[in-house]
Amino acid sequence: MSEGTIRINKVLREFNISLERAVDYLKDKGHVIESNPNTKISDEVYNVLSNQFAGDKGNKDASKEVGEEKRKEKEALRVERENEIEEKRKVDEERQRQEVIRAKAVVTGLKQVGTIDLSAKSVIKPTIIPGVKAEAKAEVKTEAKVEAKTEVKVEVKVEPKAEMPVAKTPEKSEQPKQHVAKETLVKEKIFAKEPAKNVAKPIVGKTPEATSKPSVEDAPVDETHETKYTKLTGPTFSGQTIDLSQFNKPKKIIEPNKGGAKPAGAGNNNNNKNKRKRIPTKSGEANATPRVPGTNLIRPNTGGNATGGGFNRANKPGFVKGARPAIVPKVEPTEEDVKNQIKETLERLQGKGNKSKAAKYRRDKRDTHRQKSDDEQRELEAGSKTIKVTEFVTVGEVATMMDVPITKVIGTCMSLGIMVTMNQRLDAETLTIVCDEFGFEVEFITTDLEENIEVVEDSAEDLVHRAPIVTVMGHVDHGKTSLLDYIRKTNVIAGESGGITQHIGAYGVELENGQKIAFLDTPGHEAFTAMRARGAQVTDIAIIVVAADDDIMPQTKEAISHAQAANVPIIFAINKVDKQNANPEKIKEKLAAMNFLVEDWGGKYQSQDISAKTGIGMKELLEKVLLEAEVLDLKANPNKPATGTVVEAFLDKGRGYVSTVLVQAGTMRVGDYILAGKNHGKIKAMQDERGNNVTEAGPSTPISILGLAGAPTAGDKFNIFADEREAKAIAAKRTQLMREQSVRVQRHITLDEIGRRIALGQFKELNIILKGDVDGSVEALSDSFSKLSTPEIQINIIHKGVGAITETDVMLASASDAIIIGFNVRPAGNAKQLAEKEEIDIRHYSIIYAAIDDLRDAMEGMLSPEMKEEITGLAGVRELFKISKVGTIAGCMITDGKILRANKVRVIRDNVVIHTGDIIALKRFKDDVKEVAKGYDCGIQIKGFNEIEIDDIIEGFTEVAVKRKLK
């Protein structure tokens, strides 16, 4: 990027404005820039935008700051919420851990049962069990420090006595000791943690410790050891019964344990879940160490001794193997918990829960796709109501793009007061109005082209008077060309085929007084509507020629409508007044009925009775033309590049493409670069209507030029450029646009069209390649041929152009199965031999009537014939003869016409047709006959119908194919 410049898209982001807003504001301030985000602007333009839109920048910055503050607030709230959740989680974990600890403390407190009478400890001597010393040491390590010290002292005193063998203990005392030890062991396994599993072992050895010296340390032992209930597991027997149900109460909590770890010794039997079975052991097994939980053979990845093994509670955090799950007291829910629970319930009911994030993602994705498809459909529907057109679009192309019958488009234009034809081009304003009538919007794509053509503004001192441009219009054979022949002192009619004008002519005439007039001669045939419309658009004054011995004809009315649409003055020339049956007053009366009151009758329209053959009234007519021109005060600037309109174009075999143009402003010179439509070139030569070479042509001058690369379309505007590159660039762009337009106009066959053709049954197409000598004639023929199309036969003009018939045209006709029509042209080169080889039909015409009539006849020949019924005779039933295995025979008398054996018949009863069929047999007496005439009787048997009755009428008829005519 060069210093001092900046791209406008960066400025737009800085000031928070749109590109259109910036471009419009700069345009108002006198700075015209391209509407492109990558356009570079200078510091001066930047300052202009800064002065205007600094407020928008401030608003954007303020909005950004507010957005940043909101983002920070949201982030702080999110962090605070996460901290609260984390803190709450820690509190819950701590509370759960405390509950577990409290539960353990409560369970161990169950040992403090004060209902056991210890007075019997002096009666029964203690039984010393070997191995108590080692187990006692293990207990010392698991107890608290204070308890450990106390029990160590006791063990020192008791140990010598423990070594003494005591064998006189009764056998019955063995069972209570074993019973109490096992019971205590079960309790410890259920409620204690894993390190406390061995606590039950030394309890057996503590009993003799307490009973060994009751008199020496009676009080201290009671203080320290009564709360531990070390006497419960002693071997002494007091004779009292201990209620074990108080120790079995917590077992109810174990019932929900499904698949988890079971208490030691429970095994895999489901019957042991509720109550443990007591198994008495032998004396030799009394000292056996109880099985430690977890020592069973357990397979990997299973749930221990639990049934099923599918759920392993050991994976839970805080789980202690061998201990019961903690009893967590029910906590009263807080208000926040209640709100969260209600919110989760509502979300589940509304389908917004978090039970499946994947399902929610898929649902949101479906909604997004559905919304996107709906938006695309709406855009497509909106786009279908918008048509993109260029300045070259015609009425037929517009009708095709809107998919509207062309007759409706032409009718709409006529209702707006615009007389148009199928191939006539519409200006932007008219096109917008017409499309709006059908609910379409028009988008023009050629605005950038007009900006490249420099328009020179005319100053008052540069304007000079120019000659008027006069167009002569009227019905065919009313004398338009004869009028110009008399004025120009020439004989144009002799050169026209069939004595009618088929080309638009442009002539310059200099009168005796030195004044000049430019005349345009338009054809009067109905096919040349477009030519008349072009003549009216470029003219200053219109002369409507009406034959005094004729009437106001359709083309006369059309010419008047064209002149009115172009808003040009009208002069009526009533011709052929020299004839005996001429009646000019009748013509004026008809004009008055059309709201055209001539001056002779007190109106504002000028009229003149003339005779183009004898010259009657010609001088007065020219004077009225000059008077009208003087009133109009026509001026133009000759000191600028020429602009004007293409009147006609044709291909001259020796000179190339020749274009007849009418200069409306400026001056055209040999050597100038010209652009007309999509064609461009350098002017090589200029000639007037008489073939004289000229070097320059000023305003209101009709001239023929050579040098264009192709034949421009009649009606195109032309411009003169000083630089060939500029003209070539615009021509290339227009060619591209016209190609795009042709593709846009193409319509492929639709399903509805296929259905319509199938419904018709006999749908046919006629493809035509049309070549002519001049563009105006080609356009007129194209219009006329297209109007001949019917619902059953469609005319497709697949190609039309100016020039000779070439081999390319023949190959195109062969590929598309088309016929070639040449109007005043012949095949070039080997085109004729190729057409004979490919069996392509080439038709040549020089009169437009003949071409249209031949095509109409060809279309009528393509039409399927129409079947009509002709009644041949009537027969009355007089008698019936019923024959078995044959059927019913009707004895008839022919009352009208004749009945033929090949006829179809109808059976009519009480003026109602009850059957239609064929005749199987027609006999007269016993002979088979082909026909029976009126007045004779006969026997008739009808196929498949035996319900005939007397007095029925049999009507014989035949179907005849009749050639159809185009409507």
Curated annotation (Swiss-Prot):
A single cellular component GO annotation: cytoplasm
InterPro entries: EF-G-like_DII (IPR053905), IF2_II (IPR044145), IF2_N (IPR006847), P-loop_NTPase (IPR027417), Small_GTP-bd (IPR005225), T_Tr_GTP-bd_dom (IPR000795), TF_IF2_bacterial-like (IPR000178), TIF_IF2 (IPR015760)
Purpose: One of the essential components for the initiation of protein synthesis. Protects formylmethionyl-tRNA from spontaneous hydrolysis and promotes its binding to the 30S ribosomal subunits. Also involved in the hydrolysis of GTP during the formation of the 70S ribosomal complex.
Presence of keyword Nucleotide-binding: yes
NCBIfam families reported for this sequence: IF-2, small_GTP
G3, as annotated region: 521-524
Gene (UniProt): infB
Protein's recorded name: Translation initiation factor IF-2
Region (G1): 474-481
PROSITE patterns: G_TR_2, IF2
Compositionally biased residues, Polar residues: 233-248
Residues annotated as domain tr-type G: 465-635
Region annotated G2, chain positions: 499-503
Region of interest (G4), ranges: 575-578
Disordered as annotated region, ranges: 201-320, 349-382
Family, as annotated: Belongs to the TRAFAC class translation factor GTPase superfamily. Classic translation factor GTPase family. IF-2 subfamily.
Keyword Signal found: no
UniProt keywords, alphabetically: Cytoplasm, GTP-binding, Initiation factor, Nucleotide-binding, Protein biosynthesis
Biased composition (Basic residues): 354-363
Ligand binding (GTP): 474-481, 521-525, 575-578
The organism's place on the tree of life at top rank: Bacteria
Residue ranges crossing the lipid bilayer per the database entry: none
GO MF: GTP binding; GTPase activity; translation initiation factor activity
Compositionally biased region (Basic and acidic residues): 364-382
Biased composition (Low complexity): 256-272
